[in-house]
């Protein structure tokens, strides 16, 4: 396998893991700097990886991400998205509460 491709795979996985950790990492960064030469491919692959994340019941072994831990955390995330949009940010994927269909679908899914 090409070393550049392996590096890109690791960088994508790192970005996805830091951005989708539900606040469980004390050192979670808030930005990523992507070189313009690889930006388009990097973002396309990140969005594909993010779209593959299965939300749902934390007790289901197929679930990759459960709900946020509290209403306050969900509201904080929502407020950050709203601020970003108000300041001109473009939402590339998601950006709203997830629609779930199961027993605890009213949980704090985003």
Q: Model-found features: residue ranges?
A:
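ALDH superfamily catalytic-core signature
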Residues: 1-110
